Design a protein with these regions (language model features):
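Sec-dependent N-terminal signal peptides
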Residues: 3-17
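N-terminal export/targeting and maturation segments
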Residues: 19-75
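Low-complexity, Gly/Pro
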Residues: 21-22, 107, 160
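Mature extracytoplasmic domains of secretory-pathway proteins
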Residues: 61-127
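Solvent-exposed serine/threonine-rich low-complexity stretches and specific carbohydrate-binding patches
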Residues: 118-120, 164-167
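Beta-sandwich interaction modules
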Residues: 126-139
């Protein structure tokens, strides 16, 4: 009887389909002057290595000011600051993304072969976005952004690109 139960358990486990494998590919990060915690944006790939059409990009915290663990963005962070809107590019070549707190700058998430990258115009040139840095202080009605820095690499030359944006 025990042997029959053991085989039943093994066969039951083998008959359950495995969850689809989801891989991620780092796109860019947002660092802030407030603390060492970093928001990561990753491309989410299906088992065959293509951008996941259901959820092509994910965002989450890496809590470096604490113990380095990963945490999800909370509702307010998603709706007011670090969340994003994403939709398929009309050309069919990737996705168009805007970070909620800065919708003026559109980011294109594009896949070429195995590589996935976030493309953005930095200082007038198309570039691969690597990092944003936000210098801000706490104000009475929320954060007061002093400036934003964009860091990346020129798409054509591979040289480093930088732009400092001071809100008006």
């Amino acid at each position: 009887m025990k042997k029959a139960m053991w085989w039943f358990a093994v066969l039951t486990l083998l008959s359950v389909p495995a969850a689809p494998q989801v891989k991620t590919n780092p796109l860019f990060i947002i660092q802030r002057s407030k603390n060492a915690n970093v928001v990561h944006y990753d491309a989410q790939l299906t088992a065959d290595g293509k951008l996941d059409p259901k959820e092509p990009v994910i965002a989450y915290w890496v809590m470096l000011a604490k113990d380095g663990r990963r945490e999800e963005l909370n509702w307010i962070e998603k709706k007011k600051a670090y969340g994003f809107d994403i939709k398929p590019d009309p050309s069919g070549n990737g996705y168009r993304m805007t970070v909620v707190a800065y919708p003026k700058r559109e980011i294109t998430v594009r896949q070429q072969g195995d590589a996935v990258r976030a493309e953005l115009v930095i200082d007038g040139r198309p570039a691969v976005l690597e990092k944003m840095y936000i210098n801000a202080s706490d104000g009475p009605t929320g954060p007061n952004v002093h400036y934003i820095e964009l860091y990346g690499k020129d798409l054509q030359t591979g040289r480093k690109r930088f732009q400092k944006i001071v809100p008006k």
